[in-house]
Amino acid sequence: MINSIIEKYQFSKKQIEAVLTLLEEKNTVPFIARYRKEQTGGLDEVQIKQIDDEYQYMVNLQKRKEEVIKNIEQQGLLTEELKKDILKQNKLQRVEDLYRPFKQKKKTRATEAKRKELEPLAIWMKARKHEVSIEEKAQQFINEEVQSVEDAIKGAQDIIAEQISDNPKYRTKILKDMYHQGVLTTSKKKNAEDEKGIFEMYYAYSEPIKRIANHRVLAVNRGEKEKVLSVKFEFDTTSVEDFIARQEINHNNVNRSYILEAIKDSLKRLIVPSIEREIHADLTEKAENHAIDVFSENLRNLLLQPPMKGKQILGVDPAFRTGCKLAVINPFGTFIAKGVIYPHPPVSKKEAAEKDFVQMVKAYDVQLIAIGNGTASRETEQFVADLIKKHQLPVQFIIVNEAGASVYSASEIARDEFPDFQVEERSAVSIGRRVQDPLSELVKIDPKSIGVGQYQHDVNQKALENALTFVVETAVNQVGVDVNTASSSLLQYVSGLSSQIAKNIIAYREENGAIKHNKELSKIKRLGAKTFEQSIGFLRIVDGSEPLDNTSIHPESYKVTYQLLDKLGFGGNDLGSDALKAKLNSLDMDELAIELQVGVPTLEDIIKSLKAPNRDPRDEFDTPILKSDVLSIEDLKEGMKLSGTVRNVVDFGAFVDIGVKQDGLVHVSKLSKKFVKNPMDIVSVGDIVDVWVYSIDKNKDKVSLTMIDPHE
């Protein structure tokens, strides 16, 4: 099993064995990645998960191999060669192909023919020598159930067809040939409805199977599911027929034509449809896995957007008829005030809306306005921009992706937090908090509702959920969590913690006040020694009695850390000071590691934390663009240079918010002068990028952008 992981991922045997042992000992992936680098050779969370996933697949594969071997052995049909063949397979489907001839079959044409005792005729038909004609031989098999020579011959052919279909050697060859030579074709179904022409490019479409892109596989699948498209695989079986005939028909066999008919029937009725299903399933699985990877990467970048720290924010949930809901939150995310204004039709109380809005901004010293990007967003943005200009308000605004805000607002979490609020009022608070601390707010929402994926509703939902949960867990643990201020929604993603333990932490805080030292955590229900070990490195205790509790240094390394500080003449209160940084920069890591009897990777991490105890990995990402004016599509001209925020990355390019109603598309071919296979190699969600307007379609409200400077 380990060898197959080495072959697939190029990790060393030592690394793989270390990861499997650590996982067996109930260590979490974030804990292993952060605090067991000496054992793993510095593998990150994704690599550790790859080892775990592949190992679990191999365990299940081995279990299935043993089941198959046992079943064949019980039939008395297991040969040493077959056993070796089964054991060497590394794909489940190939094991099933080898097992196929020995499976208990449902009622088929061949099983019926065997029941009618026609198997001897099939064996005779394939034999080298024949003393009588096939018609004479078939005559011997006529009975109550086999009423004619034709029926007997047909039954024998059915048996031969199924034997050919069950041959794993033929299936492997056909699978390979069809994948490399076959063509996927699609056409529009008669009377199918596709009002918006979503699937127009697939009305008469064909592409070699081996070249079809992942996003096209999912588009075709959706079109088929919505009964707009018919999907077929085209494959010329002539060469395969010849190949099988050479294996199955003895030289000078007078029954050649009958066996050829059986071969053609086997291909058309049994093998090709089965292989088509397998290829379709493989293409779909590959495309779904890729879509999940795209969604995961986009979500990771969204979660790790830098927080807007220290700002008083006004969140706005725009709407027409029901009014724009307003909510002010302070720099700590605490709700301060709420209101509702009706600047848009059909109510159109614009003067009153202006008065109330300006009054709220001034009364609460609002520094930033966060506007949701849903219904009436464009009109609200214009309204806010006009007021900033007219009243010379010292504020800027930002457009916030509000996907999932309504899901959160109607959730139990939101009802518990704001029991007396309307759903839209909760949304306004959530929109404001999304800017202030995206990670803390977005963890309250089912990741699938955040909407930064591609065909996310078309993929395996369980696989998607597992992948996205892993992304959220990784992001939360990379950033770290303040144990005294974090919500239970955030705490439950901390390494080692469950939703129940997260609630117990909240209950403890409410009863006892702020936690001051890591040892206090042992008083919390269900937070035992193992849970403490797995979680404490990712929890932060701000203004506690132990300075190291506010760093990512694990308590298991506190002794070494204080030995280091003592050696340099510093104490726990000197963390992050310029003097300490200067001393730390002049150290010989290898010598020091030997002296302190600690691994170099752990020592490097300790020193990073001592230099920057409050380091936040999100600070490395681009900060969002703040605005005080708006653009319309009429303002755009081809060649115009703009700065924008990447909102979504898909296989065919990236959608960039440039401040007009619709996000502009930078096609994959316009991301760089060089060939780009994967847009994610160039851009990520949240990136601030320079773009130029490539083309404008005002009728469709579409803007095409390029990241290639047209003047170069």
Where are these regions (language model features)?
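Duplex nucleic acid-engaging cores and interfaces of nucleic-acid transaction enzymes
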Residues: 47-50, 57, 61, 66-315, ...
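Feature marking long nucleic-acid-engaging regions of large polymerase/nuclease enzymes
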Residues: 18, 27-42, 352
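Structured, non-catalytic alpha/beta "coupling" segments that mediate domain-domain communication
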Residues: 71, 98, 223-236, 248-271, ...
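Generic start-of-chain signal for non-secretory N-termini
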Residues: 1-17, 24
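Single-stranded RNA-binding regions, centering on S1/OB-family and related RNA-binding modules
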Residues: 544-545, 549-712
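Long, highly charged, low-complexity intrinsically disordered interaction regions
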Residues: 53, 60-77, 87, 416-425, ...
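A glycine-rich phosphate-binding loop feature that marks nucleotide/adenosyl-phosphate handling sites
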Residues: 176-183, 316-320, 375-376, 400-407, ...
